[in-house]
Amino acid sequence: RRQRQMCIRDRSITDRGKIGGFMPTFFHGDHASTFVTGSYLRGIRDFDVQAAYELLLNNAFVEGSGKGPMGGRRFIKEYMEQGWISEDDITNPKLETVAKAAVTKTQEYAYDDYATALLAKELGDSENYEKLMKRTDSYKHLFDPSTQFMRGRLKDGTWITPFDPKRPFYEYMYREANGWQSTF
């Protein structure tokens, strides 16, 4: 019932998106894509799906400031160009180190791209469906076959070292996670 209210009566998620030009983002992804697509696929259709879809496309293709929940996806240009988000080169990162959380963002963006692609297909937008489906494999660029874990990479593509998959981080490589949690 609440899901229906957010799409129809309150229109809050789309209305909030119209204010800033992007669907609201949460944590590191823009899971409005899963919410809107899931609602549509469940038969909730009496909302302005086209407006919601256009905002989801902004999230997927337009660089946002990433400042707050109205800023769109951060690092989307880098994600689109190289297929993944690189991590900052930080010497001796600590648990609370603040960086790009690049592994987590890449994984979440790939998931959000999949959700938006499903909506594109439902709406007959085959061009964006194809583009987004290609990006759903982006997370694979951060799987290190030598360690068998999801792992951060630097801008030049080298793996971050040293690497301990048990070591958690607040926002370095992962968001409140470690290699084990991000892989399995």
Where are these regions (language model features)?
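Short, small-residue-biased leader/transition segments that mark boundaries at the very start
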Residues: Q3-I8
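Active-site-adjacent helix/loop patches that line small-molecule binding or acyl-intermediate pockets
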Residues: S33-T37, L56-A60, T136
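Well-ordered alpha-helical scaffold segments within catalytic/enzyme domains
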Residues: F35-R45, D112-D125
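Long, hydrophobic, well-ordered secondary-structure blocks that form the structural core
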Residues: R9-I13
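Active-site-proximal structural scaffolding
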Residues: G17, H28-S33, R45, V49, ...
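Catalytic cores of carbohydrate-active enzymes
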Residues: T14-D15, A117, K121-F184
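Mature extracytoplasmic enzyme cores
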Residues: Y40-T106, L119
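Carbohydrate-binding/catalytic loop surfaces
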Residues: K18-T37, R73-A101, R151-E176
